[in-house]
């Protein structure tokens, strides 16, 4: 018995220690917080305290933007917002990212009304594009552009930069959509249209035949309308790429979105950089002799390095891609990837020059440029320049290009 007692004593020691400390714990629980505890600031979160932009940040000022020094360009301004006692610090958008509110001109109103009436969707609205009023309005009626989103508004993929809804089993395809889309576009009097779609991995063909049928209906109703198809990768099924490429479109676009190393982090895991390259390359193999234009787009500001962008451009040229666009990545919501950097206009101009020097037919590069931004003006101007034998340029007006083309044809 004498040998057991010490072991029991050791076994009960932790319990006695806990019981002794319990009164202290209860005492701490009833002590009111001190003044220093009540005034202790809340831990900052990245979204609320660093990246949230106010509505006013998206409005352009009446005065023209002033040139910024390098130090000013990389130092973003902050502001205190909110009621007294609940103030928070936000980072304001750079001046070059501010846009005017949609003015609602006749083209804009007509397009929006018809979309609602025919139950059609546009990526302009679903992806919250900042250029919607400029593209839907157009510099004149024939220069207006619109981007119709086919096959519904719900995607089967979940890319970390995109604000489009996602679901494994979206609604069934609307069999009337090809005809309704063609009817709307013929009515609007546009000069150029971009057709895009959500990814439909739930369909055996990825929606390729639905896409192709829509293009054929459009060309039947209005052969003069230039059609660009911005497609997904069809899970790498090149036969489905061929179906769309042979449907009568003028421009085949597929976006690589970002550099190769960031692709697994930015895009859905079912998409790869090399798979996207194979799509663009196959289009040229199928319809290259007929002069089809291929196009892609990259977002900047996701953390990419300069040498990675150069490597992406080199790969795109090897795939014989004709047109490339660069734009600033803008975070749609707090659930999406954060902006790593706001790229300055000078840097976008640098990439514009480099792309043209590498042999791309055309490059649109700027903070607010999107894959289909001013698609009609960019395409028409540069194809007409090429037709006239003049080197493709990054600047110029649609009117000048049309006049140049008319002079060339009259002299033949």
UniProtKB/Swiss-Prot annotation:
Main subcellular location: mitochondrion
GO MF annotation, one: 4 iron, 4 sulfur cluster binding
Residues engaged in binding [4Fe-4S] cluster 2: 155, 159, 162
A Pfam entry, by short name: Radical_SAM
Catalytic activity: [[Fe-S] cluster scaffold protein carrying a second [4Fe-4S](2+) cluster] + N(6)-octanoyl-L-lysyl-[protein] + 2 oxidized [2Fe-2S]-[ferredoxin] + 2 S-adenosyl-L-methionine + 4 H(+) = [[Fe-S] cluster scaffold protein] + N(6)-[(R)-dihydrolipoyl]-L-lysyl-[protein] + 4 Fe(3+) + 2 hydrogen sulfide + 2 5'-deoxyadenosine + 2 L-methionine + 2 reduced [2Fe-2S]-[ferredoxin]
Domain of life from the UniProt record: Eukaryota
Cofactor note: Binds 2 [4Fe-4S] clusters per subunit. One cluster is coordinated with 3 cysteines and an exchangeable S-adenosyl-L-methionine.
Pathway(s) served: Protein modification; protein lipoylation via endogenous pathway; protein N(6)-(lipoyl)lysine from octanoyl-[acyl-carrier-protein]: step 2/2
Swiss-Prot/TrEMBL keywords: 4Fe-4S, Iron, Iron-sulfur, Metal-binding, Mitochondrion, S-adenosyl-L-methionine, Transferase, Transit peptide
GO cellular component assignments: mitochondrion
Gene3D superfamilies, per the entry: Aldolase class I (3.20.20.70)
Subcellular location: Mitochondrion
Needed co-factor(s): [4Fe-4S] cluster
Coiled coil: none
EC number(s) from the headed UniProt entry: 2.8.1.8
NCBIfam families: lipA, PRK05481.1, PRK12928.1
Family recorded in the similarity comment: Belongs to the radical SAM superfamily. Lipoyl synthase family.
HAMAP family to which the protein is assigned, alphabetical: Lipoyl_synth (MF_00206)
Name the UniProt record assigns to this protein: Lipoyl synthase, mitochondrial
Organism from which the protein derives: Fusarium vanettenii (strain ATCC MYA-4622 / CBS 123669 / FGSC 9596 / NRRL 45880 / 77-13-4)
């Amino acid at each position: 018995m004498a040998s057991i007692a010490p072991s029991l004593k050791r076994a009960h020691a932790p319990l006695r220690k806990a019981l002794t400390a319990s009164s202290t714990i209860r005492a701490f629980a009833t002590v009111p917080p001190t003044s220093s505890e009540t005034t202790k600031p809340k831990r900052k979160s990245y979204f609320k305290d660093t990246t949230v932009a106010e509505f006013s940040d998206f409005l352009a000022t009446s005065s023209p933007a002033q040139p910024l020094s390098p130090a000013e360009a990389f130092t973003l301004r902050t502001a205190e917002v909110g009621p007294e006692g609940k103030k928070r610090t936000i980072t304001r958008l750079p001046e070059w990212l501010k846009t005017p509110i949609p003015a609602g001109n006749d083209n804009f109103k007509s397009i929006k009304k018809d979309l609602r009436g025919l139950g059609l969707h546009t990526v302009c609205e679903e992806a919250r594009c900042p250029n919607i009023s400029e593209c839907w309005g157009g510099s004149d009626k024939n220069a207006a552009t619109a981007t119709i989103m086919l096959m519904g508004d719900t995607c089967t993929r979940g890319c970390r930069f995109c604000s489009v809804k996602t679901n494994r089993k979206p609604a069934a395809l609307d069999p009337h959509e090809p005809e309704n889309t063609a009817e709307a576009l013929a009515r609007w009097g546009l000069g150029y249209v971009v057709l895009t779609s959500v990814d439909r991995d739930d369909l055996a063909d990825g929606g390729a035949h639905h896409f192709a049928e829509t293009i054929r209906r459009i060309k039947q109703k209005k052969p003069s309308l230039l059609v660009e198809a911005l497609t997904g990768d069809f899970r790498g099924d090149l036969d489905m790429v061929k179906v769309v490429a042979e449907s009568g479109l003028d421009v085949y676009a597929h976006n690589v979105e970002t550099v190769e190393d960031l692709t697994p982090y930015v895009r859905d895991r079912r998409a790869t950089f090399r798979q996207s390259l194979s799509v663009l390359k196959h289009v040229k193999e199928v319809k290259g002799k007929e002069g089809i234009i291929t196009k892609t787009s990259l977002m900047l500001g996701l953390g990419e390095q300069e040498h990675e962008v150069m490597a992406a451009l080199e790969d795109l040229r090897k795939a014989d891609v004709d047109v490339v666009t660069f734009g600033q990545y803008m975070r749609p919501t707090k659930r999406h990837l954060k902006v790593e950097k706001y790229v300055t206009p000078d840097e976008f101009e640098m990439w514009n020059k480099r792309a043209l020097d590498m042999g791309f037919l055309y490059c649109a590069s700027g903070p607010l440029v999107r894959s289909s931004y001013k698609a009609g003006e960019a395409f028409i101007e540069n194809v007409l320049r090429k037709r006239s034998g003049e080197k493709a340029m990054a600047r110029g007006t649609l009117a000048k290009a049309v006049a140049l083309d008319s002079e060339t044809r009259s002299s033949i």
